[in-house]
Amino acid sequence: MEEGFRDRAAFIRGAKDIAKEVKKHAAKKVVKGLDRVQDEYSRRSYSRFEEEDDDDDFPAPSDGYYRGEGTQDEEEGGASSDATEGHDEDDEIYEGEYQGIPRAESGGKGERMADGAPLAGVRGGLSDGEGPPGGRGEAQRRKEREELAQQYEAILRECGHGRFQWTLYFVLGLALMADGVEVFVVGFVLPSAEKDMCLSDSNKGMLGLIVYLGMMVGAFLWGGLADRLGRRQCLLISLSVNSVFAFFSSFVQGYGTFLFCRLLSGVGIGGSIPIVFSYFSEFLAQEKRGEHLSWLCMFWMIGGVYAAAMAWAIIPHYGWSFQMGSAYQFHSWRVFVLVCAFPSVFAIGALTTQPESPRFFLENGKHDEAWMVLKQVHDTNMRAKGHPERVFSVTHIKTIHQEDELIEIQSDTGTWYQRWGVRALSLGGQVWGNFLSCFGPEYRRITLMMMGVWFTMSFSYYGLTVWFPDMIRHLQAVDYASRTKVFPGERVEHVTFNFTLENQIHRGGQYFNDKFIGLRLKSVSFEDSLFEECYFEDVTSSNTFFRNCTFINTVFYNTDLFEYKFVNSRLINSTFLHNKEGCPLDVTGTGEGAYMVYFVSFLGTLAVLPGNIVSALLMDKIGRLRMLAGSSVMSCVSCFFLSFGNSESAMIALLCLFGGVSIASWNALDVLTVELYPSDKRTTAFGFLNALCKLAAVLGISIFTSFVGITKAAPILFASAALALGSSLALKLPETRGQVLQ
């Protein structure tokens, strides 16, 4: 009996050992399968876990960052690293095994970062509850961020710079191009849209400013959300809002609905600049960041060139239109508005193929997601360089301890909108708190200085770039008025006028039994004249007025001579029949003036190309501050040449000069803003500063254009003073060249 019992016990122990070994191997196979499924970016059947038979050839690592660097002690003991096995004492798989994440108790011995620098703690010491209850001190969090920044920079160097970054460059370039297009759309369509929508001068002014107002709101909104919800997600939503309402604005008929659509379109595109620069910078190593962010700025110029070229090619084609009665009209300028939404639509489609920023994942404690994205970057670049066999060696990356999370409530608590309301309030509170932290003791001085630089730059740049075309139009008007023909005291009887009268003044004339049929009047004025027994039929006019005139027994049939065109005039026994329908306001429509707007904008945006190239090549060589201050000083000097601009050609040349030298300061300012703030505040601060930029633009445009036709001294003085102040403030900012991204 006793011998049989011993045999039975031995059999049971052997069965348990076999079952345990089978379970172990089955678990490893499952993990390998998961790793291959998750490794969709490398497109090769490579597993990060070595076969057990190969353990002697590939010893397990002793730390949590690299493979293939095991210790002799582990080999002799027959033990495998938790970083590669992922089993506890009971042979259970723990969460994160497939990512190669070391267990907490295994990370305390000899952990090191990707560049070999020592690093204390387990799993970054961030999620195991160390530190005082209720959160740790700010000094500890600052230390964590510095360690993460150093390790992240080393990982980006290992990933290299190649196909992935260039693909992302063109994708984000489309989003930046959409922002450049948005700035020009309203200005290009106004000469045509004012007739269809019957826009007064105040309506046109509001339409021009509403876009900047929308972009100001959008920059602050999407910039704040991108630090909480993610760069890619917020950029997709903001571009979707822009494209949807840009599409609607091409079809709506009323001024109010068009204004509303352009406002929301501006809100959508407002998130483009803050998110795009922050997003792209987090995939760039330190030695590439300044140059490639400057190359990215070129897409804003391409957006302006695209808008000007499309306006030139589409709007003058009046045949590209249709109408359904008098209620609905779709003219060529609406086609232009539709075409201007294409960059945003294409950017949305391309952005869906790109991953979220790994730096955002790490800042929010999402280690596994960040690892997968960085592995995608590494494998994409290595395949493109002809080294597909190179393996991404990093297995563990530091993450930041999260002290606050979005409030979650049970699904059966209240209604769905109450739950969403709670989450929205929580998110809004976090965004606002993050914004206020930009004015905390650590960043208050930087933020205030950056506010001054952004405001002065935007005030002078946008003010002058809008003032230039207005000055050109004023010079055109002065030249046009100098060629006005005056006909005094003429007497005309029994004559039929069926041609065009343009740029003429008729004073003291007498017209008896005359017929004005199919006549077109453009910038014609009749003063102190008499019309008796005359007949007006199918007459169209623009900028035409009858001042102190008398009409006796005169008939007006199917004309657009509305009441406001008769200034202090008397109509005795005169009749108006079937007046033309449409806008009763006097609009100039499209013509040479509109072509000049397209041409000037095209040249002005194209002129920044040399400045873009120079700034990109020198950004990492001379530094951000020297580039910003030097370009601002050169822009300030170029302002003094404006006093010599007394002709159209001279003003166009000065516009190109100013744009060419000022673009370098904008590029440097964008790079500096990205590098001065940490990753958890980057888009929030950038969005706020960009919103301030749009506010300064509105003020600059309003002030500068008020001096058109009065004096050139005031705009020159304001712009020069603002640029000088901005350059002096810029020199007091810290230089960020050569620093890792915080």
From Swiss-Prot:
GO biological process: intracellular calcium ion homeostasis; synaptic vesicle priming
Transmembrane feature ranges: 170-190, 206-226, 234-254, 263-283, 295-315, 335-355, 448-468, 599-619, 627-647, 652-672, 686-708, 713-731
InterPro entries found in the cross-reference section: LD_SV2, MFS, MFS_dom, MFS_sugar_transport-like, MFS_trans_sf, Sugar_transporter_CS, SV2
Modified residues (Phosphotyrosine): 480
Broad class of where this protein is predominantly found: other
Region of interest (Disordered), residue spans: 33-144
Organism: Homo sapiens
Compositional bias annotation for Basic and acidic residues: 33-49
Signal peptide region: none
Domain of life (superkingdom): Eukaryota
Glycosylation site list: 498, 548, 573
Residues on Cytoplasmic side: 1-169, 227-233, 284-294, 356-447, 620-626, 673-685, 732-742
Protein name from the UniProt record: Synaptic vesicle glycoprotein 2A
GO molecular function terms listed in the Swiss-Prot or TrEMBL record: protein kinase binding; transmembrane transporter activity
Lineage: Eukaryota, Metazoa, Chordata, Craniata, Vertebrata
